[in-house]
A protein has these predicted regions:
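Alpha/beta enzyme core
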Residues: 2-233
């Protein structure tokens, strides 16, 4: 890439999409990871609630607390000088009320130093996304397989596998974009569905198990190194 900024910010991602440049996002959980990835030129560092499984040995992301994400976000932001740092909002830290979401997101920005937060869900969280962005807090969306809903979904299953489900996912994606999200994670959906969503949206799409026709890709260091694989059930 040419003309790399010293510090990536939300508007730079839109510009990268316009130029047809691929966006690279990796999960990072501590200062060492963040420093290595930052020096390698990774665009976005996601302090994911996946730290529950990767770092803490939990079965799901659901037990991860706001304090845990805050702790790791502080470590990552101390070491990342160029990459955009996005912090996951954990399970039930934004679903009860918009005021709750605002308060919890504010901690990730003020105390953690995050440049953005990520919320799972589509139309159900659109009002929350709108309120956060109106308050000046950048939001990344996340649709498809949403790990915080693993019990309702019946496990880590590929989503949007039939036409009706694909249509519902498209509505969710459009709602999140309309609410002001600056980017959208598409996880565990068929390649064709991800391509269709990417072509409809004006914001960047970041794929996790969603094929190649997306604006960027996300992975974790454990997946890249072969220490841990993330697989999805197809039935």
């Amino acid at each position: 890439m040419t003309g790399l900024p010293k510090k990536l910010r939300v508007p730079h991602l839109a510009a990268m999409k316009e130029r047809g440049e691929r966006i690279v996002m990796l999960t990072a959980y501590d200062a060492t990871m963040a420093r290595l990835f930052d020096r390698a030129g990774i665009d976005i560092l996601l302090v994911g609630d996946s730290l529950g499984q990767v770092i803490l040995g939990l079965d799901t992301t659901i037990p991860v607390t706001l304090d845990a994400i805050l702790h790791h976000t502080m470590a990552v932001t101390r070491a990342a000088s160029r990459a955009l740092v996005v912090a996951d909002m954990p399970f039930m830290t934004y679903q009860i009320a918009i005021e709750q979401a605002m308060r919890n997101a504010a901690r990730l920005f003020q105390e953690g130093g995050a440049a953005a937060v990520k919320l799972e869900g589509g139309r159900a969280v659109a009002d929350t996304v709108r309120a956060l962005t109106a308050a000046g807090l950048p939001v990344m969306g996340h649709v498809g397989l949403t790990p915080q809903h693993v019990h309702r979904l019946g496990g880590m299953r590929q989503q949007a596998r039939d036409d009706d489900a694909a249509d519902e996912l498209m509505l969710d994606a459009l709602a999140v974009e309309d609410a002001g999200a600056f980017a959208l994670v598409l996880e565990a959906i068929p390649d064709a569905v991800a391509a269709a969503v990417t072509s409809r949206l004006h914001i960047p799409t970041i794929g996790i198990g969603a094929g190649l026709i997306v604006t960027g890709k996300c992975s974790s260091v454990t997946t890249c190194s072969g220490c841990l694989t993330r697989s999805y059930r197809l039935s």
